Design a protein with these regions (language model features):
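ATP/NTP phosphate-donor binding region
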Residues: 1-105
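Glycine-rich beta-strand-to-loop/alpha-helix junction loops that act as flexible
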Residues: 8, 54-55, 109-112, 130-132
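Basic, gly/Ser/Thr/Pro-rich low-complexity segments located predominantly at protein N termini
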Residues: 10, 14, 18, 115-118, ...
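A broadly conserved amphipathic alpha-helix scaffold signal in soluble, globular proteins
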Residues: 96-99, 116-120
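Short, acidic/small-residue loops that bind anionic groups at enzyme active sites
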Residues: 105-109, 117-140
Length: 140
């Protein structure tokens, strides 16, 4: 596999249920850290192209800046250029673009809502879900 896509939802894990249930909150800075680890792990396995969904928090830009500054980045990172709406339509549009690009897989740090939107938008690309959402309920 030479390329992967990453769809990190900056809105996942911020539901009111997290606050009232004393659940762990995964803020967007931690999502940047998670995506950095995904990129480093992928490039360690031979991935040389990483495509990241553009988003309102600029997770992809922060990842590129941090890894370039640390001189750890060897893979090419590119943001998927879409018209941002700040809602699920960004996830759906990006997943469809990544499938058209034939990335090796999509890695999705997000919740069951993010992953459901991706799964409904793709047919052939494997999806790797990383739980960072509120409920994270997945059917069998």
């Amino acid at each position: 596999m030479t390329s992967i896509g990453i769809i990190a939802n900056p809105a996942s894990g911020k539901d009111i249920r997290r606050l009232v249930s004393h659940a762990t909150v995964i803020d967007n800075y931690e999502k940047v850290n998670i995506v950095e680890r995904i990129v480093l792990g992928a490039q360690g396995c031979g991935v040389d192209e990483v495509y990241i969904m553009a988003d309102t928090f600029q997770i992809g830009n922060r990842v590129m800046d941090n890894l370039a500054a640390s001189k750890e980045l060897k893979a090419n990172i590119r943001l998927i250029d879409i018209n941002l709406n700040g809602n699920v339509s960004d996830t759906i549009a990006t997943a469809k673009i990544m499938e058209d690009m034939k990335v090796g897989c999509i890695v999705a740090p997000g919740g069951d809502g993010t992953n459901r939107a991706i799964a409904k938008s793709i047919d052939k690309i494997p999806l790797i879900s990383l739980s960072t959402g509120t409920n994270n309920v997945y059917p069998d």
